[in-house]
Amino acid sequence: MKDVKGTAMSSDLRVVKLSENIGARVDGVRLGELDAETAAAINQTLAQHKVLFFRGQDHLDDESHFAFAESLGVPTTPHPTLKFEGSRVMRLESFAGGGANQWHTDVTFVDRIPKASILRAVELPSYGGSTTWASTVAAYQQLPEPLQQLADGLWAMHNNAFDYAQMDIDPAKLAALQANPDAVLKYAAEFHSAHFETHHPVVRVHPETGERSLLLGNFVKRILGVNSSESQALFRIFQDRITWLENTIRWNWELGDVAMWDNRATQHYAVSDYGSQPRRMHRITLAGDIPVSVRGEQSRVISGDATEYSVIDSPTARVA
C-alpha cells in the first residue's frame, strides 16, 4: 500500500490525500472479502483520513459489499428501528424529498455508536446528489483553548425523535410528495417505532487514535445542564466549527463508487439538489464502542435497548 507520497505499506494499494483535514482516495484494490493485511491497512488509513473513497467497484452487490464490511469489523443490523426484511444492508432511497440533508453522525441516539459506515452508489440522478463529510476532530483541534475546556465538560442528549415534517425539501419535489406522502409517513412511523435516548459527552476520545472530537449533529436535542437558549447557543458555536468548509470534503458520486467513513470522527450531509430524480444508495455500518469522555466517563443510556441492533466492539481507548 502506498500512502500520500508513495511509501510502500501493503499490496498494490495507493492512498491519494484529497484535502488537508479530511478525505483520501484509495486505488488498487478490488473490494469484497479482503485478506487480513489489506483490511488492517484500510482500517489504519481510515483512522488517519476519516473518510475513504474507492472508484471502479462496479462488481459489488449486496453480498460482496457485506463481505467487505465483515473484513473490516462486525456489521450491525441495518438500523435500530427501520426494517429491511431479508436484507443485511440499509437501502437509502429518495422518496420525493426524503434524505439525510442535515448534518449528522450516524445513529448517535444509541449508546454503541457505529465505528464506520460503508456506502455504495446503486442508482444516481443525472445531476446533483453529492455527499459532504466534515471532520469533527479537526473542528475540536481548531477551537481556542477556553472553548476546548468548556466543550470537554459538556454532555448532550441525543434521541431519535426526528421531526420529518421539518425536512428541508427541494421545492422541485413538493408536488410528488404532496401527491403521495405515504412513503414519508411510513418511514417516519418506523423510525419512531422505538424510542432511544442517550446522553453522550460533547467531546469523545477516539478509541484507536486517542484524538478528541466533537460529538454533535442533528440527533442532539439539547446540551445538558443549561437552559434552552444557552443550549442552542453552545450547539451553534461547536456545530458551526465542524462545518467550516476547510473541515469538509464533497464527493460527486459515480456508479461503482464506495465511500467509507469513520463515524467516530465525522459528520456527513447528503445534498438534496437533484429534484425528483431517483437516488439509491446501500449502506452497511460496523459495530463500534460506547463513547468515552476526556474524563473517562462512558455515555449513558436513558431509554431504549440497542442490543439487537449491534454488539459493542471496543478497542481500548486512551486519552490524547
What do these predicted regions represent?
Residues 2-260, 264-320:
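Fe(II)/2-oxoglutarate oxygenase catalytic core
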